[in-house]
Curated annotation (Swiss-Prot):
EC number of this enzyme: 3.1.3.11
Protein name per the record: Fructose-1,6-bisphosphatase class 1
Protein's pathway: Carbohydrate biosynthesis; gluconeogenesis
GO CC, any one term: cytosol
Organism of provenance: Vibrio vulnificus (strain YJ016)
Keywords: Carbohydrate metabolism, Cytoplasm, Hydrolase, Magnesium, Metal-binding
Family: Belongs to the FBPase class 1 family.
Catalytic activity: beta-D-fructose 1,6-bisphosphate + H2O = beta-D-fructose 6-phosphate + phosphate
GO BP terms, alphabetized: fructose 1,6-bisphosphate metabolic process; fructose 6-phosphate metabolic process; fructose metabolic process; gluconeogenesis; sucrose biosynthetic process
Subunit annotation: Homotetramer.
Essential cofactor(s): Mg(2+)
Residues engaged in binding substrate: 118-121, 211, 244, 262-264, 274
Amino acid sequence: MSGMRTLGEFIVEKQADFPHASGDLSSLLSSIRLAAKIVNREINKAGLVDITGAAGVENIQGEVQQKLDVYANEKFKSALEARDQVCGVASEEEDEAVAFNKELNKNAKYVVLMDPLDGSSNIDVNVSVGTIFSIYRRVSPIGTPPTQEDFLQPGHKQVAAGYIIYGSSTMLVYTTGNGVNGFTYDPSLGTFCLSHENMMIPQNGNIYSINEGNYIRFPMGVKKYIKYCQENVPEDGRPYTSRYIGSLVADFHRNLLKGGIYLYPSTQSHPQGKLRLLYECNPMAFLIEQAGGLASDGVNRILDLKPTELHQRVPFFVGSTNMVKKVEEFLEVYRDEA
C-alpha cells in the first residue's frame, strides 16, 4: 500500500503533540499495541479453545468475570509493567489500583486506567468487544509508590485515551489531545496501519443507541427523548434509527463514524448510572470531544467531573453535539418528574 503508515511510525511522528515529549508516551502506547495483538489473537480462537464463558468469580462490581476478562487484564497489566513508563494501573477487574513496585517502574511518570475487555459477555455469541484505556501523568512525587490521587483525576487531565475494537477487523483508535486517529490491524503484516486519519463525528446524527428494554426504569426526560427520536418528522431526519449492540466500544465506534448518540442513563435500579467514570466514560469523553462531539452526565460535562472513588458510576450521554444537547434539554425540562 503506497504511503502506508504504521501505528509505530505515526506515534513517533506525532510525539511532538505531547507537551512533555520524551518518547515515554510513545513507548507506553507501544506496550498497549503489543497487548492488543496478543488479546486479539486469543479472541480469534474463541470457540476453538476453552477461553469463553464465565471464570467462576465476580469482580468488584459484582459482575461475573468471563475467562477472557481475566486473560485480557493480565496481558495488559504485564505489557504495561514491562516498560518503565507506568507506575500503576487501575482496572475494572481489580478491586484496588495496582502499584508496579519493580525497580524498572520506580521513576515512571504515568498511570493507566482500563477496561481490559468491554462487552466480554458477547464473546460467546461472536459479537464485537473492545478494550478501553486512559492515561494520566501521576501527581504524586516520582520515585514514590503511586497514590489514590494519581488515579482520581478529572478527565480533562488525561494525556491520552483510546480503545481497541475486536470486530470484523481489529482497530485501535486513540487521541493525545490533538485529534483522533484510527489504525486497522493487518494480520498478514502483524501491524496496525493508519486507516482513519483525523476522525470527526457529524454534528447531527440519525442513530440512537440505548437498551430500550429498560424503558420503564428510565427518567422521564430520557423517555421523552426516545419518543422524540421515534417521531415521524422527515424534514428533521426523524424517525431516527435505533441501533444497540450492548458493547460500549462497538456502539461508540459506529456512532463516531456515522453520527449518533449513545445513552446509558440512571435507572431505578442504578440511580448513579451503570458505566464507570474513570475507565469507560472519561476516555470515551476525551475521544468524542477531540472528534467534535460532546459527552455529558445529563447536566455536566463528563471531563469536568471530580472522581471520588475508583469504580464510580455515572449516567452517560455521548455522541453528536446536537443530539447530546437535545437530550440535555429534555432532562432539564422533566428533571422533577420520575
